[in-house]
């Protein structure tokens, strides 16, 4: 399967965004827009989600487009929660939104990688292939656990102050 220029931009930025997100979460605990890594993640994520909305090779509007919209909504929610303290839970919303957006990146990425690799015998030929479903569940559990850990540390920090 050949990849278009917009597909390459989408793939490269999306991959870099995921790598940067993992780096941020593992070194700083949370993604935020106040440092350069966080800014890069947010900008790359919005560009990746926006370019996803321009791709229709797989038969029109589909799950990947819905996830792109959810990604943009999550980023907007994360940015908004950084700027405004909503009922004292803005930090929790920020953590959930930004970290959740990583999952929205991963789901279509998993399907695309498994559709293409290995080249001679791809693992998952459709979005709903059992191999892909297993990966979705694994990464949903990892991201969900990460969000719960982030919330725990926010709660602990808040209760100590």
Segment roles from a protein language model:
Residues 1-161:
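Alpha-helical membrane insertion/targeting regions
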């Amino acid at each position: 399967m050949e990849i278009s220029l917009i597909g390459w931009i989408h793939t490269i930025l999306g991959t870099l965004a995921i790598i940067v997100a993992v780096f941020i979460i593992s070194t700083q605990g949370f993604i935020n827009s106040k440092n350069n890594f966080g800014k890069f993640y947010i900008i790359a994520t919005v560009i990746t989600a926006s370019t996803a909305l321009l791709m229709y090779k797989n038969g029109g509007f589909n799950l990947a487009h819905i996830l792109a919209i959810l990604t943009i909504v999550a980023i907007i929610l994360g940015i908004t929660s950084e700027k405004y303290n909503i009922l004292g839970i803005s930090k929790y919303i920020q953590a959930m939104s930004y970290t959740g957006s990583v999952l929205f990146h991963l789901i279509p990425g998993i399907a695309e990688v498994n559709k293409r690799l290995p080249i001679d015998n791809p693992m998952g030929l459709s979005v709903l292939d059992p191999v892909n479903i297993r990966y979705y569940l694994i990464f949903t559990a990892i991201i969900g656990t990460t969000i719960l850990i982030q919330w725990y540390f926010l709660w602990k920090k808040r209760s100590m102050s």
